[in-house]
Design a protein with these regions (language model features):
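Membrane-proximal intracellular helices of multi-pass ion channels
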Residues: 1-321
C-alpha cells in the first residue's frame, strides 16, 4: 500500500505541474492536461514513452526549464527505489538512514553530477549537440538531462545520433549501472556496482572486509554482487555478439552495443537501428529486456534446477591474474 501511495502522490503532484505547463506555457489546451499526466507517469516509472512522435522525444524542448527539471526529478525519484523513499520519510537525518539508503543516494549523486560533467566535457564543442546551443544554462541542463535519463528513463533532449562515439560509450556505462533495487528502473543496480568498487579497492589495499559508512558489508552480499555483475556482463556480451551477427555489418558496432545495453537496462533510448533487424534480432532484444527487468539471475535460474552439493571437496589454491 505504501508503494501505491508513494507512486500516486508523486505522479499526481508532478503531473499537475506538467499538465499546467503543457496547458498554459506550451499552449496545448485540454490536450496538454492529459499529456502532462502521461509524461509524469512515464518518467516516474522510467518508461520513457513520449507523445511527440517521429522519435523526437524531448529534443524540441531542451531549453524548457520546467519540463526538464520535472522529468529529471521524476526519473531520479523513481530510480532510487521505494525502500529509500520510505526510509527518507521516516528518517530525515543522514545518520539515521539505513546503510542501503546511504549507498543508493551516494551512488545516485555521483552518477548524476559526475555524468553531467563528463557529457558536458565530451559534447561541449560538438556543434550538432551542446556546441550549437545558445547559452551556458541550456548546455548544462542538456548534459544533466542525458546523465539522468541513462538511469533507465528513455527520454532524451539531444539527438543521440549526433553525439560523439565517446559520449555514447559513456552513456552505455551509465545505462549498464542503471537504477537502484526496488525501483522502477533496470540495469545492474547502483548498489551492486558501488559494493564491487569498494570491495576491489579494499582488496588492492590488503583489506579483507568491505566497509561503507562505518558498516561492514556481509561477505555473502559481496559475493552476490560479483555474481550479478558477472552474469549481467556475460548476458550483454552474448547478446551483443548475436546481434552483430544479425546486423551483418549494416550499422556501426557501437550503435549495436548501445541498443543491447539500453534493452538490458530497460532504458528505452535508441539510435534508430532496431527496426532494421530481422525477427531473430528483435527476439534477442526482447529476451534481453526481460532478463534485465526481472533480474538476470532470477531469469536464468528459472530455467535451471538447483541441487544441493552433498559432497565437499578438498580445496587447493591456483594462480589468478
Amino acid at each position: 500500500l505504501n508503494v501505491v501511495k508513494y507512486a500516486l502522490t508523486i505522479e499526481f503532484i508532478f503531473g499537475t505541474i506538467l499538465a499546467w505547463h503543457f496547458y498554459s506555457a506550451l499552449d496545448m489546451g485540454l490536450t496538454g492536461i492529459a499529456w502532462g499526466y502521461w509524461h509524469a507517469i512515464s518518467a516516474f516509472c522510467n518508461a520513457g514513452f513520449d507523445l511527440f512522435g517521429d522519435y523526437a522525444s524531448l529534443t524540441g524542448h531542451y531549453n524548457d526549464i520546467t519540463l526538464n527539471l520535472c522529468i529529471m526529478a521524476l526519473i531520479t525519484i523513481g530510480g532510487i527505489g521505494f525502500t529509500v523513499l520510505d526510509d527518507l520519510r521516516r528518517n530525515r537525518k543522514w545518520k539515521k538512514l539505513r546503510l542501503h539508503s546511504k549507498i543508493v543516494l551516494t551512488a545516485s549523486a555521483i552518477l548524476t553530477f559526475g555524468g553531467t560533467l563528463v557529457i558536458l566535457a565530451l559534447e561541449y564543442t560538438n556543434p550538432a549537440t551542446l556546441g550549437g546551443m545558445p547559452n551556458e544554462l541550456d548546455k548544462w541542463m542538456a548534459a544533466a538531462f542525458q546523465a539522468v535519463t541513462c538511469r533507465t528513463a528513455g527520454f532524451n533532449t539531444i539527438d543521440l545520433t549526433d553525439m560523439r562515439a565517446s559520449s555514447l560509450f559513456f552513456m552505455v556505462l551509465l545505462m549498464g549501472i542503471g537504477a537502484s533495487p526496488t525501483s522502477t528502473g533496470g540495469g545492474m543496480k547502483t548498489t551492486t556496482v558501488l559494493v564491487l568498487l569498494v570491495s576491489t579497492w579494499g582488496l588492492l589495499h590488503g583489506k579483507r572486509d568491505t566497509v561503507l559508512f562505518d558498516r561492514r558489508i556481509a561477505s555473502e552480499t559481496v559475493d552476490k554482487a560479483y555474481n550479478v555483475f558477472t552474469v549481467c556482463l556475460l548476458w550483454m556480451l552474448g547478446a551483443y555478439f548475436l546481434l552483430l551477427i544479425c546486423d551483418g555489418g549494416l550499422h556501426r558496432a557501437d550503435y549495436v552495443l548501445f541498443e543491447v545495453v539500453s534493452a538490458f537496462a530497460t532504458v528505452g533510448l535508441g539510435v534508430g537501428i532496431t527496426p532494421d533487424w530481422n525477427d531473430w534480432g528483435k527476439l534477442i532484444l526482447v529476451l534481453t529486456m526481460y532478463a534485465g527487468r526481472i533480474g538476470v539471475l532470477t531469469f536464468v535460474l528459472s530455467f535451471l534446477h538447483s541441487k544441493d552439493d552433498k559432497i565437499r571437496y578438498p580445496s587447493e589454491n591456483i594462480m589468478i591474474g
